[in-house]
A protein has these predicted regions:
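Conserved acidic donor-binding segment of nucleotide-sugar-dependent glycosyltransferases
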Residues: 285, 312-313, 317-325, 333-338
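N-terminal subdomain of nucleotide-sugar transferases
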Residues: 1-46, 89, 209-214, 218, ...
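Nucleotide-activated donor-binding/catalytic signature segment of Leloir-type glycosyltransferases, i.e.
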Residues: 189, 223, 229-261, 271
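A short, active-site helix/loop in glycosyltransferases that binds the activated sugar's phosphate group
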Residues: 104-105, 122-124, 130, 134-162, ...
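A short, well-ordered alpha-helix in the C-terminal region of glycosyltransferases
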Residues: 333, 340-355
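Conserved donor-binding/catalytic core segment of Leloir-type glycosyltransferases
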Residues: 4-6, 141, 170, 174, ...
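Nucleotide-sugar-dependent
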Residues: 202, 248-290, 300-308
């Protein structure tokens, strides 16, 4: 099937949405589909986007600039994307997270709209509602059951929507191609890892409190924009905390084996870059699945949305995000219990390989949709609705 993937953000970038988009295009290509990605030009200096993200396939990427960072600019770019789609070989399916691009191209082919939050910023108001009512809408993909329920409620006037729930995913680790990075700190103490952005609501303050309470452990935080790293480093001052800053996604797998325990201390309100959105109710964090793919023992926040994937005492330990005593006890106990670490990590990896790979997700989100000449995509890994 010929798939046009429409992304309103930039490639390459240091944002998580770029990782998600590139992984999905890679997985669609691995499944035998002919994929072209339409994106905005890169906002991060990387000569080779494929190498930067560590994807296995070199699908075409067409960069379409945003003339100005306003709704009018987004619409002008969307019309340019539509012109390119109309001039190229017609796609069998348009897929994406860009409501402007999908709305502009809705008459060209059936389309799938993937949602990661309920957006309040699409202009003019009603654009998304009209998109969801279009006769060529084939499916809505939501990353969590919580989001699917809220999204359906927000658009209840349209009646039942064709929503499929497909969580984020991770790839099984590839064989290492380079030596593991040499980490600062003490070589003979347990290493606690966090991988991800340093935005408000990600629990960085909780990590620093744990580091203060447990001076016998070293804490390594991988990721974060320069300004966020500087803000947290400036308020830290602990000798057992190390901020490593942003790393290309392709390099992250080399860090995971160094960590004895990994943390996902999300708070009840989780913010995106610049506090432009609050997504804690609906999150499906890619870092959790990457932790799982590497078989690392996880301590995560006990939040309803995370319980869609995580099970306390089975594939992780869950603790309330606002109870640092419980986190400190759990971390100290897990560090001291090698058998429990192995059991949690092994089960997390088993579940990842069985349920949450990008290839499985690619098959699931396309299952049953019309393909070339009206054929249906195979239902090999069909997902349930919500």
């Amino acid at each position: 099937m010929r798939i046009a993937y429409l992304h309103g953000g930039t490639i390459p970038s240091f944002f998580a949405n770029g990782v998600h988009v590139m992984r999905m295009c890679d997985a669609f290509t691995a499944a035998g589909h002919d994929v072209t990605l339409y994106t905005a030009p890169g906002s991060y200096p990387a000569d080779d986007a494929y190498a930067y993200y560590g994807v296995r396939h070199r699908f075409p990427i067409r960069a379409v600039p945003i003339p100005e960072d306003t709704p009018a600019g987004y619409w002008r770019r969307a019309e340019r994307v539509r012109d390119l789609l109309a001039g190229d070989t017609a796609p069998d399916l348009v897929y994406g997270r860009d409501p402007y691009g999908l709305a502009a191209a809705a008459d060209l082919a059936p389309f799938v709209y993937e949602v990661h939050q309920i957006r309040r910023d699409v202009s003019p108001p009603g654009t998304e509602h009209r998109l969801l009512g279009h006769q060529r809408l084939a499916r809505v993909v939501a990353i969590t059951h919580a989001l699917a329920r809220d999204f359906q409620e927000a658009h209840a006037a349209l009646g039942p929507l064709p929503i499929l729930v497909a969580p984020d995913c991770a790839d099984p680790p590839a064989p290492p191609t380079a030596a593991a990075p040499t980490l600062p700190g003490r070589p003979d103490v347990p290493r606690i890892g966090y991988v991800g952005h340093l935005y408000d609501g990600r629990g960085i303050d909780l990590i620093l409190e744990l580091a203060d309470r447990l001076p016998g452990l070293d804490f390594h935080l991988i990721g974060g924009a320069a300004e966020d790293r500087a803000r947290w480093e400036g308020s830290c001052g602990l000798p057992n905390v190390f901020f490593h800053g942003h790393r290309p996604p392709a390099e992250l797998p080399s860090y995971y084996p160094s960590f004895d325990v990994v943390l996902a201390p999300y708070q009840r309100k989780v913010y995106t870059w610049g506090r432009l959105g609050e997504t804690g109710r609906w999150a499906s964090p890619m870092k959790l699945f990457e932790y799982m793919s590497h078989g690392r023992p996880i301590i995560a926040s006990d939040l309803p949305v995370l319980r869609e994937v995580l099970q306390d005492g089975v594939n992780c330990l869950l603790r309330p995000p606002d109870e640092p005593d419980a986190w400190a006890d759990a971390l100290a106990g897990l560090v001291a219990n090698g058998a429990l670490r192995r059991a949690l990590g092994d089960e997390a990896r088993r579940q990842l390989l069985d349920r949450y790979t990008w290839r499985r997700r690619a098959d699931r989100v396309l299952a049953g949709l019309p393909g070339p000449r009206g054929e249906s995509s195979p239902n090999k890994h069909a997902a349930n609705g919500f």
